[in-house]
Amino acid sequence: MIQMQSILEVADNSGAKKVMCIKVLGGSHHMVAKLGDVIVISVKEAIPGGKVKKGDVYKGVIVRTKTGVVRPDGSTIKFDKNALVLLNKQDEPIGTRVFGPVTRELRAKKYVRIMSLAEEVL
């Protein structure tokens, strides 16, 4: 579960390495974000020459969480780190590649483009 002030890794090649959650989108009572939710982030660490700069504010969709997700068959998928993919104003991925695995639950949230860019879909 991701809340305000949580630090996440970036799973795409947009140039950002670490980001901090500054707002969870989805209503006034939405305090934590889960897999597939959209959050507003601030870039805390970026590589030189990347598409994004330190201090920039973007939206991002969460693709991996430590708490994981429970599937209807009862199985649970958890990851070692929290990660997200940065989105532009039109809710399209900024990067052209997604590193690491993503889950099938993103398809239900209408993020098929992220699934097609990912190395592996679990």
UniProtKB/Swiss-Prot annotation:
SMART domains: Ribosomal_L14. PROSITE patterns: RIBOSOMAL_L14. Keywords: Ribonucleoprotein, Ribosomal protein, RNA-binding, rRNA-binding. GO terms for biological process: translation. InterPro entries: Ribosomal_uL14, Ribosomal_uL14_bac-type, Ribosomal_uL14_CS, Ribosomal_uL14_sf. GO terms for cellular component: cytosolic large ribosomal subunit. Gene3D superfamilies: Ribosomal protein L14. It comes from the Bacteria. The keyword RNA-binding applies. One of its GO terms (molecular function) is large ribosomal subunit rRNA binding. Pfam families: Ribosomal_L14 (PF00238). Binds to 23S rRNA. Forms part of two intersubunit bridges in the 70S ribosome. Part of the 50S ribosomal subunit. Forms a cluster with proteins L3 and L19. In the 70S ribosome, L14 and L19 interact and together make contacts with the 16S rRNA in bridges B5 and B8. NCBIfam families: rplN_bact. PANTHER family: 50S/60S RIBOSOMAL PROTEIN L14/L23 (PTHR11761), LARGE RIBOSOMAL SUBUNIT PROTEIN UL14M (PTHR11761:SF3). Belongs to the universal ribosomal protein uL14 family. This is Large ribosomal subunit protein uL14. It comes from Rickettsia canadensis (strain McKiel).
